[in-house]
Amino acid sequence: EKKTVYVSVFNPAGPSVEELKGLYVESNGYVSIDAAKFHRKQEIGEIKFDIVDGLGFDNKVVRLGDPFAKTPYYDGLLLTSNYVAPVRGNKFPVLEYDFYSFQTGPVDVYTYMLPIFPLDNEHGSRYGVMVDNSPVYLPEAGAPYYSTLWIQSVLRNCRINKTTHFIDKPGKHTVKIYCGHPGMMLQKIVVDFGGLKKSYMGPESTRIN
């Protein structure tokens, strides 16, 4: 007896695989980004971006500045809220990750951070998340001691934060991660267009090599 199996395949005429090489590409409704494999970085003053081996789900994380470094000054930006206006200018320490999307509309960006305690009351645990020229969101890598969120983050060895952005057209885009309070550690970034499935460690990288 013959049976027919139907398989859904997405095979657009363009861009070619060659054109996508080196980019993180949307696959099954999401883009998964390896934090240690950024496309560009801009270091300012004392703020340097370091790859730290032996930590995180993939045994490698990016440290957003030395925790003892002076917190960067952002003109008109206070590191005390979850949202700020678009960052203008190029005087900020930032990591940039290029990705290619086939869809448009609202997207959720998940940043996977190592859970961390600030050094003291003068240090926080905020970092910036931006897509293209969107507003910047400032989630926290830390949580109040012994809170439910802190316990969950420690058990999972990861603090996962969600910010929502807007993709206006298909094509190449850029996720930007800003150093807010130095010392935060980034494991992974996932851009969800609606296809992300629930998992413990998040999806593997969708970079085309």
What are the functions of these language-model segments?
Residues 1-209:
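Extracytoplasmic
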